[in-house]
Amino acid sequence: MAAAAACAIGMLATSGEAAPRRTTERPVVVELFTAQGCAGCPEANLAVEQAAETPGVIALTYGVDYWDYLGWRDTFAKPAFSARQRAYRSAMRLRGVSTPQVVIAGRTQLTGAREVELGSAIQREARRESWPPQIEFRETGRQV
């Protein structure tokens, strides 16, 4: 019986399965701005998809419409998603918008995304001493 257990443990250790994902210390929102016609987006899409498997990570994907003028109409894009990305550009004082772009916890941004780089940024944001999040409500015409 002990030999069977040791064999099973050895098989698990060498089976090539990925180690369980580390849980973030606090919930972290990860926003991906992407486009169907973007050559660099599949890698970022995959990295965010893998990050979403981490307990505590809330992944959101936004298809932007500003590449539609090139002739490839993105079926997931919405003007509101492009506006959200431009709002981050202003808030973070970035020079422009691009795809893919990942915004982590509304504070950190990555242009493009590789799994290791994204994982490190998520863990950094999860450890930040800014919990609970700062929330601001503004009245803008008919919306709050």
Q: Can you annotate each of these PLM segments?
A:
Residues Q134-E139:
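Short amphipathic beta-strand and strand-loop transition segments with alternating hydrophobic
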